[in-house]
């Protein structure tokens, strides 16, 4: 008996392969491989986020308590 194979390849999902004959049915699900372009885009976004964090760190103002005023509980 010939084996029948169906492959479903989605642009956004996993690759699903269904193989069957009269004796058994096999379903394989594999994660979609990222294209090199998508990986480079993700890396550039990560670099931009890192730059944003550095800018935010520069804008932090430290407030020091030097007024010598103590609060006493009575």
UniProtKB/Swiss-Prot annotation:
A Gene Ontology biological process term: symbiont-mediated suppression of host adaptive immune response
Q: Which GO terms describe its cellular component?
A: host cell cytoplasm
Protein localization: Host cytoplasm
| Induction line | Expressed in the early phase of the viral replicative cycle.
What keywords are assigned to this protein?
A: Early protein, Eukaryotic host gene expression shutoff by virus, Eukaryotic host translation shutoff by virus, Host cytoplasm, Host gene expression shutoff by virus, Host-virus interaction, Inhibition of eukaryotic host translation factors by virus, Inhibition of host adaptive immune response by virus, Viral immunoevasion
**Top-rank taxon:** Viruses
Functional summary from the UniProt entry? Plays a role in the inhibition of host protein synthesis. Specifically, inhibits the initiation of cap-dependent and cap-independent translation. In turn, affects the outcome of infection by decreasing recruitment of inflammatory leukocytes and reducing the memory CD8+ T-cell response.
Family label: Belongs to the orthopoxvirus OPG173 protein family.
Any idea what this protein is called? Answer: Protein OPG173
Q: What is the organism lineage in this UniProt record?
A: Viruses, Varidnaviria, Bamfordvirae, Nucleocytoviricota, Pokkesviricetes
Q: Please name the gene that encodes this protein.
A: OPG173
